[in-house]
Amino acid sequence: MAEFNHVTVLLHEAVAGLAIQPAGVYVDATLGGGGHSGEILKQLTSGHLYSFDQDETAIHYNQANLGPAIEEGKLTLMQTNFRNLKQALADQGVTAIDGIVYDLGVSSPQFDDAKRGFSYQHDAPLDMRMNQDQPLSAYQVVNEWSYQELVRILYRYGEEKFAKQIARAIERARQKQPIQTTMELANIVKEAIPAAARRHGGHPAKKSFQAIRIAVNDELGALEDSLEQALALLKVGGRISVITFQSLEDRLVKTMFKEATSLPDLPPGLPVIPADAQPDFKLINKKPVLPTEDELKVNHRAHSAKLRVIERLK
């Protein structure tokens, strides 16, 4: 069994953001190593937690890790993508929830398990699937997607300004023979980026690997679907805590939360906004919560984390 030495980022802040009711119904949308689930379970008495993860490694690990809570009937593990949130909960007889937490991005064990192919630090087959049962892998994206599709995902999901050069280099390399491994891909990307640009900004393949991973797992599409369902499922007083690790995710969450907390178009000059026109949701923090200096010292992966929390008012 894979060992989850995953340090959960903003653990206490994210769970505190949910304002847990001991008898409430909660969801951990991203089970991973069970950090948030374990913290939520400590605060539940007669409540119940549904913890989602499409990665069977996380499910198997937590069947043992959180076994006592499962036996007590306080926890149900759900092996499915969180974009299936509404249907998966309905199958359990749940149509409303008191809170849900999202901890986005790849969990450390997925990065650290070389054979999963998420990292440019280890040589491994090109895979990057969070759900290992799905057919689409990084191998197909890199070897079969067109030049135009590669440029699109590198720009859109990697914010990579050398997207065209990288896509062209991938196209040239795969015409000779298929690109099989993460190291092959990392070297192709590195060579495609001008030498001057390689000297700063971290590993030259970082943005490309992020872009391909997001494309393989449709991460942004899944997040948008899931958040829409979560907003609809929330009871009055219920909250959503979302931890993001990169600007694309954070922008999506910020936009969706802004939309949910905005006033409708009203005639100008109204002295008082009628109660039924008030927004259904409010932001708990105007600005995102960031990790403390102490947390950054012990967890280098926390540096880009941001927490946003929203509450249903009516």
Swiss-Prot record:
Keywords: Cytoplasm, Methyltransferase, rRNA processing, S-adenosyl-L-methionine, Transferase. S-adenosyl-L-methionine binds at G34, G35, H36, D53, F82, D103, Q110. It catalyses: cytidine(1402) in 16S rRNA + S-adenosyl-L-methionine = N(4)-methylcytidine(1402) in 16S rRNA + S-adenosyl-L-homocysteine + H(+). Pfam families: Methyltransf_5 (PF01795). It comes from the Bacteria. InterPro entries: RsmH, SAM-dep_MeTrfase_MraW_recog, SAM-dependent_MTases_sf. Specifically methylates the N4 position of cytidine in position 1402 (C1402) of 16S rRNA. This is Ribosomal RNA small subunit methyltransferase H. The lineage of its organism: Bacteria, Bacillati, Bacillota, Bacilli, Lactobacillales.
